[in-house]
Amino acid sequence: MPAENSFDIVSDFDQQELVNAVDQTLREVQTRYDLKDAGVTITLTKTELIIEADSEMSLRSVRDVLETKALRRKLSLKIFDYGKPTDASGGRVRQVVTLRRGIDSELAKKLSKMIRDRFPKVQPRIQGDSLRVAGKSRDELQAVIAFLREREGEIPVPLQMTNYR
């Protein structure tokens, strides 16, 4: 039996599921009566999503459809960081949606402090855009996981626990 057990806390999402959600959103937008003539375009890159429509109301409707499709595909809505709608050419409206991936250093420090204060027997370590929590007792690590699941509403990014050993 290993002397120390550990798990990683990461914040990531399935890129293919996001592609599928965007495709389904475009398909629904093209068939919906209220959005059919809105000229909606959605451009997806690795780090952002650009939604363009003819009015702010259409933009909000597309956003609602996108969120519904993302939830059905088991994607957290916390991955979307919506920017302010801006005017685009031709009287259109554009909104840039930044996709959140990884745990930034400020949040990693906050999570590390939360874990250390509550569980003195485990050692959280920041590793780039993830956090490794190590401890001797598996029960203690499972308690940390349960604690983080309870606090999920306070954390601005979706968390996944991986590499539990």
UniProtKB/Swiss-Prot annotation:
Keyword Nucleotide-binding: yes
Any one GO cellular component localisation term in the record: cytosol
The keyword Nucleotide-binding belongs to this UniProt entry's keyword annotation: yes
A GO MF term: nucleotide binding
Cross-referenced Gene3D superfamilies: 3.30.70.860, YajQ-like, domain 2 (3.30.70.990)
InterPro entries the record matches: DUF520, UPF0234-like_C, UPF0234_N, YajQ-like_sf
Coiled coil: none
Assigned keywords, A-Z: Nucleotide-binding
A Pfam family that the UniProt record links to this protein: DUF520
CDD domains: YajQ_like
Function: Nucleotide-binding protein.
Annotated NCBIfam families: PRK05412.1 (NF003819)
Family under the similarity heading: Belongs to the YajQ family.
Stated name of the protein: Nucleotide-binding protein Caur_1852
